[in-house]
Amino acid sequence: MADTAGRAGIKIMQRADFHEIFQCSGPVIVPVIHVLDDARTAANIDHIIDAGLKGCFLINHDFGIDAFLPVLEAIRGRYPDFWIGVNFLAVTGLKAFPILADLDERGVKIDAYWADDARIDESAVTQEEADNIAATRTDCGWKGLYFGGTAFKKQRPVD
């Protein structure tokens, strides 16, 4: 990954790094699966693999994190080398990164986290909440990719 350092010393990914991860030079398609259970999630991943895609995001759209974690464990066990990112619905990295680090310690590797809200305030000079999230990520040691949304739906109005 490029040596370019961003806020809080986090390395900034360059386009070439992203393409290297997915072993392609063009657009990368990463479907999102709204998880219901292990079996349907596995069937959806099988369709994704059959289509030649390299990964997916899983989201717990209608249930909490505690019920989602066993699904993640089962899916990672079934697809140990498939690229998997997750979204814990409405959860920032502040809470998610320690959970992901714990999963990693137990052998459940999650490749990326997508947060709907990265807690960036475009009207502020300092980004205390985003910096706290970055510090939490560093402190817990989770090394996956982080996709953090800004001005995402259902958040505060943007000027």
Predicted regions and their residues:
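Short intrinsically disordered, low-complexity coil segments enriched in acidic
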Residues: 1-3, 159
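Active-site mouth loops of central-metabolism enzymes
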Residues: 27-41, 86-95, 150-158
